[in-house]
Amino acid sequence: YERYKQATNSDEITFSEFLSQYLTFTDETTTLAIQKNLLSVMKIYSEFVVSETYSSIRPGQSYVVSDTALCTGSAVIYDMCASEGGYTYIVTNYHVVYLEEADEALNGASKIARKIYGYLYGSESTPAASVNVSTNTVQKDENGYTKYDYGESAIALEYIGGSVSSDIAVLRAKTSDILAVNPCAAQVELADSYHVGETAIAIGNPEAQGISVTQGIVSVESDYISLNIDGSSRSYRSIRIDTALYSGNSGGGLFNAAGKLIGITNAGNSSDENINYAVPLEIVRGVADNIIYYHEKGYDAQCAYKIVLGIIVQTQNSKYVYDAGSGYGQIREEVVLDSVASDSIAESMNLQSGDIITAIIVNDTEYEIARSFDISDLILTLREGDVIQCVVQRNAQTVYSEEYTLSKTALVAIE
């Protein structure tokens, strides 16, 4: 782009216009992008203790058998610290490392996996029950549970936090441990945006058969699905794709044709073909950065944090707006305050029922609110000490709310 401006001695064309006019993606460039992405993906195995109750041959009696169980999924290398002693952060789905059926009392007082291992592409192995060669019997650990051998290429991963309501979990490993397996391992690149019709490439571990690639398109930018991960049904905002996904793809990366991450694949529709889902990049980035930030700050709740504004919103005048200059369009809507809770942050900012929120200013940077979920996405990025202010339309006038400085006491843990 810089060379183009120098050659033409012109600044009239924007970078996005330059891309749309002069940069095209062929099958070859997409293949090259996928090849690079293979340095940033992992397959995951999570180990739990589960207990099953069996009926005894004696009437009215039963007995319980406890043993290890393995679940598999996928992940992406999200952030690598190359400094000595640094950590690499890895993102997957919460449901890849959480098992509702786990025996909490025997699984380390948690339903999060007691052990998590990852494998880089090209260095993959499959865990197997350890066998005592001399007796030809399965080895047991100190608790009497089946012991698994994960192989030399397995990388031990530590769970540092997650959000069941976003279906995102963050793991970490010493960067040196990852580079010892593959010195070329790299973190993913994040896309700036994604659009309906855009190429959607999934890289994951379908059916635990090893890392593989499928390709489709983005069908719907923002859809809602219901998932039951921990015994409670929740609604999840998702990207709908027609890219083929299978069990084991969960937690894997969804990439565009340029090889940049646009989401984390997490669900499929078993009854309908070509309808699958991914956690949108805004949520992936918001939750992951949030968890990493507060983990490094010493917060020990293993979760993300947010503020509660104390508002209920409604939307109106939703429409699709096409930009001929960029060649892209988006759905836009008016976000109207339906109610403001007493003694809330919103009330202290002097927001009122009927206000139309058009933007939120964070530390002097203005962020447009074009959809209702833009508010919750932005809230994930807020940190203690940030100063926020709302821009609203009130009685056909543009009004700036009072400023509010986020305190530590305003933060609440996200499920």
Positions of predicted regions on the chain:
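PDZ-domain C-terminal substructure recognizer with occasional recognition of PDZ-binding tails
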Residues: Y148, A156-E158, I292-Y305, M349, ...
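Active-site loop architecture of trypsin-fold serine endopeptidases
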Residues: Y94-A113, I178-A185, I203-G216, I225-G251, ...
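A conserved glycine-rich beta-strand in the N-terminal activation segment of trypsin-fold
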Residues: T24-T31, S51, I57-V91, A154-E158, ...
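C-terminal cap/linker of serine protease catalytic domains
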Residues: A113-I116, A128-V131, L261-G329, L411
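PDZ/PDZ-like domain segments forming the peptide/carboxylate-binding groove
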Residues: S74, M80-G85, C184-A186, T243-G248, ...
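PDZ domains, with a preference for the canonical peptide-binding region formed by the helix
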Residues: L106-A113, E273-N276, L281-E282, A359-V391
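Gly/Ser-enriched beta-turn/beta-hairpin loop segments
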Residues: V65, I160-S166, E221-I239, H295, ...
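Catalytic-histidine neighborhood of serine endopeptidases
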Residues: M80-S166
